[in-house]
């Protein structure tokens, strides 16, 4: 598989270290750096428990996807499994849903990049920075998969070092007495208890917490280009979860011990507050580099992910055939360009449209992710049933099957209910049936076209 091939094969150019950090980088993004502030305000120190619960659900989903991917490492990942074990509409819907999800995320991250650049150069409009990084990252992804893996590896390294530095520095402030009189582990329970707003405060935040873990399923997408999927996928799946729990739970435990949670404001990153102790300008610049890297890293993953998903859809016959080709370096150029074109349109819409349109798009991301994870779990149940009937013993079985699947599905349902009760998020839940109808129409059109072609 390692040779230069032309036609319809992706090149296996990703090593285990790339796959580990692609998943880790996908999960350490804006959610941890900025999103945790509003959760802390609502849930207090209980956010730590929230991340543990969401981390467990994410791990179950990753293991379900991991089991399928180790057996059949193909491009298109779970849309392939939904297609093969559940039915052609399920494959069509899950693939396109995932593609749209990451186009929306890509657009959001590019906008964030523009805002971060303004920290240094306020006179540069956001759309200019977004356009520059849009061109650079897409150009890099057009070279070959190894370059993508290498770039994502270093992006993720920067984020990981920043979080580790924060944990070490925070722990030093805490235990050396240099953190001031307010720094004490008792902050975790002194200010109105571990769950100051009761369990309700935590439950209402589970939707936002869950989306910090979105991106973990990137491990499944990398399978077709992994050097040795039978070994690297189980390893990446099992190790990533420990690391994420250390990064999320570790950093938040240190953060919330350093000062009372009541001092966290929704419009500032909690990380800015803690690094503030180092002295203003150095910290502000260092942190801005980190959040900029985080946004670029997630956008980089989006470009990779979208092109591979579209490639998989084309191979299944769910997208135009021209998208199922790769160049002599094994890069799916057409799918990268098509995904880029749509993302560029989003940047334009984002530039022209008021903030409300952008808020709505982000709420759609939330719903698309729920559909995505639920479909992984459902496709896995069908996959396991089929394998049991064939008498096949899988090499990397998921945890707690089938109970684990039902736990995940109940969790997704609960998240949707929570979103219905959350102002600004409810609209995206109402749009789920509309989106499914659009997918249904697209599927019928595809079937009709395929029949017409056969008739000729």
Curated annotation (Swiss-Prot):
Residues 1-18, 63-85, 138-154, 222-239, 292-332, 379-398, 446-456 are cytoplasmic. It catalyses: L-phenylalanine(in) + H(+)(in) = L-phenylalanine(out) + H(+)(out); L-tryptophan(in) + H(+)(in) = L-tryptophan(out) + H(+)(out); L-tyrosine(in) + H(+)(in) = L-tyrosine(out) + H(+)(out). It is found in: Cell inner membrane. The chain crosses the membrane at residues 19-39, 42-62, 86-106, 117-137, 155-175, 201-221, 240-260, 271-291, 333-353, 358-378, 399-419, 425-445. Residues 40-41, 107-116, 176-200, 261-270, 354-357, 420-424 are periplasmic. Its main location: membrane. InterPro entries: AA-permease/SLC12A_dom, Amino_acid_permease_CS. Keywords: Amino-acid transport, Cell inner membrane, Cell membrane, Membrane, Transmembrane, Transmembrane helix, Transport. It is a multi-pass membrane protein. GO terms for cellular component: plasma membrane. One of its GO terms (biological process) is amino acid transport. Belongs to the amino acid-polyamine-organocation (APC) superfamily. Amino acid transporter (AAT) (TC 2.A.3.1) family. Permease that is involved in the active transport across the cytoplasmic membrane of all three aromatic amino acids, phenylalanine, tyrosine and tryptophan. This is Aromatic amino acid transport protein AroP. It comes from Escherichia coli O6:H1 (strain CFT073 / ATCC 700928 / UPEC). The gene is aroP.
């Amino acid at each position: 598989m390692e040779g230069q091939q032309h036609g319809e094969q992706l090149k296996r150019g990703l090593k285990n270290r790339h796959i580990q950090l692609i998943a880790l980088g996908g999960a350490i993004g804006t959610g941890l750096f900025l999103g945790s502030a509003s959760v802390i305000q609502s849930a207090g120190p209980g956010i730590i428990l929230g991340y543990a619960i969401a981390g467990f659900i994410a791990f179950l989903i990753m293991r379900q996807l991991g089991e399928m991917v180790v057996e059949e490492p193909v491009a298109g990942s779970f849309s392939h499994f939904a297609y093969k074990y559940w039915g052609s509409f399920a494959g069509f819907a899950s693939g396109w849903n995932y593609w749209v999800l990451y186009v929306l995320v890509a657009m959001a991250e590019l906008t964030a990049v523009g805002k971060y650049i303004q920290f240094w150069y306020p006179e540069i409009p956001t759309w200019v920075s977004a356009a520059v990084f849009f061109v650079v990252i897409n150009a890099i992804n057009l070279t070959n998969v190894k370059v993508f893996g290498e770039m994502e590896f270093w992006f993720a390294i920067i984020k990981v070092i920043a979080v580790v530095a924060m944990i070490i520095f925070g722990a030093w402030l805490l235990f050396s007495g240099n953190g001031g009189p307010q720094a004490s582990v008792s902050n975790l329970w002194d200010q109105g208890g571990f769950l100051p707003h009761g369990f309700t405060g935590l439950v209402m935040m589970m939707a936002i917490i869950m989306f910090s873990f979105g991106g973990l399923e990137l491990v499944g997408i990398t399978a077709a280009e992994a050097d040795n999927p039978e070994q690297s996928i189980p390893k990446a799946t099992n190790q990533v979860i420990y690391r994420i729990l250390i990064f999320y739970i570790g950093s938040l435990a240190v953060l919330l011990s350093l000062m009372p949670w009541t001092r966290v404001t929704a419009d500032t990153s909690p990380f800015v507050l803690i690094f503030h102790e180092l002295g203003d300008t150095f910290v502000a610049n260092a942190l801005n580099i980190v959040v900029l890297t985080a946004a670029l890293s997630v956008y980089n993953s989006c470009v990779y992910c979208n092109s591979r998903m579209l490639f998989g859809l084309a191979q299944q016959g769910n997208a135009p055939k021209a998208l199922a080709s790769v160049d002599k370096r094994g890069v799916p150029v057409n799918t990268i360009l098509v995904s880029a074109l749509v993302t560029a349109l989003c940047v334009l819409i984002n530039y022209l449209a008021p903030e409300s349109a952008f808020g709505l798009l982000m709420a759609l991301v939330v719903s698309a992710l729920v559909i995505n994870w639920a479909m992984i779990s459902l496709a896995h149940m069908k996959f396991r049933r089929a394998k049991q009937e064939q008498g096949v013993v899988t090499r990397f079985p998921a945890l707690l099957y089938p109970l684990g699947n039902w736990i995940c599905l109940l969790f997704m349902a609960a998240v949707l209910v929570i979103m219905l009760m959350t102002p600004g998020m409810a609209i995206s839940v109402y749009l789920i049936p509309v989106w499914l109808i659009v997918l249904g129409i697209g599927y019928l059109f595809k079937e009709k076209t395929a029949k017409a072609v056969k008739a000729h």
